[in-house]
Amino acid sequence: MIRRATFSDIPRMVELLCEAHAASKFAARVGVSRKAAHTLLQQAVTRNGGTNDGGTIVLVAEHAGVLEGLFVGVLNRVYFIGDKLEANDMYLFVTPSAGRADASKMIDGYLEWADANPKVDRQDVKLSYTDALPGAARVGRLYAKKGFRRAGEIFERAAQ
């Protein structure tokens, strides 16, 4: 089941972020501040369903009473200075135990939230991914199936 997150979900959502981190390219060199994760998620859940700058959508995938995935999206001013808003994803993560369609269903929930907001134009709804987690190409294909197109690249400095 996909649903909006509640405050009681935060401890498990912190664990999900830690699981994502452990599978990421950052795991060997960057630790996780559970306090920062908790604070971030608490703020996001507080603003869950918001329709103004800083508003969020926080969705979870739940199976047999256990959270197996999360999605966090946020509203910001277009180009950070615009008089309209854009929707951006912050986190999308599902465990191997999640349902096959959970990621897709959480994205659908994000799109419904963004599309219902008259301050957000359709072309200002964004989805992103990087090579931080394995399976990036699969995520890109899912986004394309949802009607999204590539809109640039992210570059990072090479380690020395």
Could you say what each language-model-derived stretch is?
Residues 123-138, 159:
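Conserved beta-strand-loop-alpha-helix junction that forms the acyl-donor binding cleft
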